[in-house]
Curated annotation (Swiss-Prot):
Structure-specific nuclease with 5'-flap endonuclease and 5'-3' exonuclease activities involved in DNA replication and repair. During DNA replication, cleaves the 5'-overhanging flap structure that is generated by displacement synthesis when DNA polymerase encounters the 5'-end of a downstream Okazaki fragment. It enters the flap from the 5'-end and then tracks to cleave the flap base, leaving a nick for ligation. Also involved in the long patch base excision repair (LP-BER) pathway, by cleaving within the apurinic/apyrimidinic (AP) site-terminated flap. This is Flap endonuclease 1. The gene is fen1. Interacts with PCNA. Three molecules of fen1 bind to one PCNA trimer with each molecule binding to one PCNA monomer. PCNA stimulates the nuclease activity without altering cleavage specificity. It comes from Neosartorya fischeri (strain ATCC 1020 / DSM 3700 / CBS 544.65 / FGSC A1164 / JCM 1740 / NRRL 181 / WB 181). One of its GO terms (molecular function) is DNA binding. Its EC number is 3.1.-.-.
Length: 395
């Protein structure tokens, strides 16, 4: 799920943190990819007539089709992908996972009913809601990656957190995931839409954490508190607290402790904190996740030549893929992984940190922009009020 409405908050309040561009812009870069999120998206998106792709023996192959061709697309564009798989989820996440399981069970029931009485659209809608990444899906994708010569590692817990460690250490350029909580784990750069199909024509979103914090006028701890208020995988959100209110509360009070205190002491009781809401534990999971350091032996990885005949055996003979396409893909892998070895010019230079004066200037511009937005909203509200009060037929 990630963080509810976080992209919207960044887009509206720290627009300079987001850069949209073509996949070709990332030529020569190594990227750590959240594998589980990618596989989930493949199971949902790679379909035929609303149903997941199947082999002749009735096995699902959408995850393998997506993994093979989307990885090929990245390598064709000079990107060197590293996939990171989830480990065991943190205990605090079990409540959210239980809710997801219950929702999927309801969707499965609704899917069966829709097949009997509903439209084709109903069937597809509920079918997508039943999707779950299994151990078998993960195991088959790992086997495929190994045969393709693409490295992968297993995270102790959250894949996004492990991707962030590798990005901070400079072993990869960025972490790639659709989950915005990757920023909470201190990934310097988050790439979104990297594993989308070319047909969707979605630009790659590049989100910079330092510019996000500067634009919001927050430190990392306050940013995490904001994300918890918005709604994360570990806790249910506070009812009636939307993105604008969450941002206002953190800016006004500075921390979740003070936000909770203000809510509990509010005589109007406008908001109610859920009974079991261990926000400090959630914050700790973001600040100190269970990860392996970048120099750990299990974080070593390298790209190798694909095993063409084993790929054909697995994808063509076992899973029913087209042999010509698989062999063509393997040839592209061999050629383009060598090409991706070329270094980008940016690798020879270190970015220059902003001075205190530059940071102060940015903050001042941001505050002025906020004041201008508030002023404009007041004027718009006043104009609407006057328009409503104006009698009909008046000139």
């Amino acid at each position: 799920m990630g963080i509810k409405h976080l992209f919207q908050v960044i887009q509206e309040n720290a627009p300079d943190a987001i850069k949209a561009g073509d996949i070709k812009n990332h030529f020569g870069r190594k990227v750590a990819i959240d594998a589980s999120m990618s596989i989930y998206s493949f199971l949902i998106a790679v379909r035929s007539e609303g149903q997941q792709l199947m082999s002749e023996s009735g096995e699902t192959t959408s995850h393998l089709m997506g993994m093979f061709y989307r990885t090929l697309r990245m390598v064709d564009n000079g990107i060197k992908p590293l996939y990171v798989f989830d480990g065991a989820p943190p205990k605090l996440k079990s409540g959210e996972l239980a809710k997801r399981t219950a929702r999927k069970a309801e969707a499965t029931e609704a899917h069966e009913e829709a097949k009997e009485t509903g439209t084709a659209e109903d069937v597809e809608k509920f079918s997508r809601r039943t999707v779950r990444v299994t151990r078998e899906h993960n195991a088959e994708c790992k086997k495929l990656l190994k045969l393709m010569g693409i490295p992968y590692i297993d995270a102790p817990t959250e894949a996004e957190a492990q991707c962030a460690v590798l990005a901070r250490a400079g072993k990869v350029y960025a972490a790639a995931s659709e989950d915005m909580d990757t920023l909470c784990f201190e990934a310097p750069i988050l790439l979104r839409h990297l594993t989308f199909s070319e047909q969707r024509k979605e630009p790659i979103q590049e989100i910079h954490l330092n510019r996000t914090l500067e634009g919001l006028g927050m430190d990392r701890k306050q940013f995490i508190d904001l994300c918890i208020l918005l709604g994360c995988d570990y806790l249910e959100p506070i009812p009636k607290v939307g993105p604008n209110t969450a941002l206002k509360l953190i800016r006004e009070h500075g921390s979740l402790e003070k936000v909770v205190e203000a809510i509990e002491n509010d005589p109007k009781k406008k908001y109610v904190i859920p009974e079991d809401w261990p926000y400090q534990d959630a914050r700790e999971l973001f600040l100190h996740p269970d990860v392996r350091e970048a120099d750990h032996p299990e974080c070593d990885f390298k790209w190798e030549a694909p095993d063409v005949e084993a790929l054909v055996e697995f994808l063509v003979k076992d899973k029913g893929f087209n042999e010509d396409r698989v062999r063509n893909g393997a040839a592209r892998l061999q050629k383009n992984l060598k090409t991706a070895q070329q270094s980008r010019l940016e690798g020879f230079f270190k970015p220059v940190a902003r001075t205190d004066e530059e940071k102060a200037s940015l903050k001042r511009k941001h505050d002025e922009k906020l004041q201008e937005q508030k002023k404009r909203k007041k004027e718009e509200a006043k104009a609407k009020k006057e328009a409503k009060a104006k009698p009909r037929g008046a000139a």
